[in-house]
Amino acid sequence: MKLLFICTHNRCRSIIAEAVTNAFGGSLLQARSAGSQPSGEVHPLSIKYLQQAGIDTAGLQSQSWDAHEAWQPNVVITVCD
């Protein structure tokens, strides 16, 4: 199943959700994340937290949800306030 996590800036929550899902979802789940107004950078504390948890941060980037339109996720989850 393909999951797309969305938040405004794709800098913290959606990035963490993507990384954790991909780390623990096995072959059943594929996750990506995006933002409606991406900041262009992942928050350094998000990277630090994930690395401390032993979760791979390679390839994580802040990007627009437009970048995932062709990917066609099965579920879109918003993680905004």
Where are the predicted features?
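Conserved active-site segments centered on acidic
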Residues: 1-67
